[in-house]
Amino acid sequence: MVLSRVPQHKPRVDGEQMFAILSHPACRPERKEQEKKGRLVSTPFSPSIPPSMTPRPLILHLDIDAFFASVEQLRNPRLAGQPVAVGSGVIASCSYEAREHGLKAGMPLGQALRKCPPLVIVRGHESIYRCYATRMFEICHNWSPLVEEHLDEAYCDLTGTERIYPDPAKEIARLRAQIHSTTGLTVTAGLGRNRMFARLIGKFHKPDGLGYLEPEQEEALLLRLPVENLPGVGPRTVEILANLGIEKVEQLRELSRSALAGLLGRNGEALYERCRGEDHRPIGGREIPRSIQRGTSFDEDVSCPRTLDAMIEYLAERAARNLRQRGLEAGGISLQIAHSDHRRDRRRIVLSPPTALDPSIIRAALALRRSMEGRRTAIRFVGIQLDRIRLAA
């Protein structure tokens, strides 16, 4: 394994850098996007990956560390080094200082404040976050022939670039340094033979690191992972598999393709390949999914309607953001709630016209929640599913 970890730096105000970012076309008012400053710190040189060890195809995954919270710390230097959470009702992102207190995305703010009384809560500024991400994407496009953009992450296809980049780790170190000097943000990089491995490898080197595994090491990593680390495995799938005594990828491999398909439908067939290290999703593809799901199991059963509504809003925003990132819209929405007595309620309504807008999707999700009122048992799980997905008009 090759690993580079960069020391954490304190953000610094830099007038020239702030002006450069705010002057960028993507940040002009007519684009409804703004951007602020960054920090200038050199990034140490990453160890090299010998060309002979470089897998082909080669996929790079870049993930901005604690994105929303990091931007807020850059915008307000007084927040540097402080536990910061971004969100309203539920944490959408939190700084690494907050994570040291056990905080995480999806946690109700009331619970977060009990765990970390000095927590600073900031409402989100999505247009500013998009502007920071745009700068990172532009750097990636100048460096890679094929880039797939998401809000806080990017996939770069480096297949066939060995002549241009004979030492991938050295070039990735330069790329990360450029992103850092331009935006003030740190990114974690994972390098693998497909997008699944690239993301998984990077996950184990957060924050501000570079991870790479040789092909034979990828297999060893995959087998010992919990199933929830695989793409497409959400809380409901984890629960279904746990009822069968399946918690690790190694156990999941014991199921046949037909068994998984019968258990999980089309997602089961994809899972059969993923648990064997296969991921054929192309970088930059415009595949239209049948549905988009977001859900969470509460650490503590919830009986407060306001806490439940805050979580539903958070999940609806995440699902809607996923639609917009992919140029899609949804024509239907379902809400599923699991109670502490194991009873499940599920209801669905049509979204007319189809939409990808936060207010419309949140309003529909909350209407579904109100239609389920009547039971007095606490809530253990809540999930949202968007369906009838199509390309945005």
Label for each model-derived stretch:
Residues Q8-H9, Q17, H24, Q34:
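Low-complexity, intrinsically disordered or signal/transmembrane-proximal segments
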Residues T186-T188, S334, F381-G383:
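Residues at or immediately flanking beta-strands
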Residues R12-D14, E30-R39, I49:
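Intrinsically disordered, glycine-rich low-complexity segments
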Residues E149-E153, G192-R195, L328-G332, T377-F381:
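Short Gly/Ser/Thr- and Asp/Glu-enriched loop/turn motifs at secondary-structure junctions
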Residues I21-H24, S42-L263, N267-E273, I283, ...:
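Gly/Gly-Pro- and Ser/Thr-rich, intrinsically disordered tail segments characteristic of DNA damage-repair
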Residues H61, N229, T237-I379, R390-A392:
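DNA-contacting surface of Y-family translesion DNA polymerases
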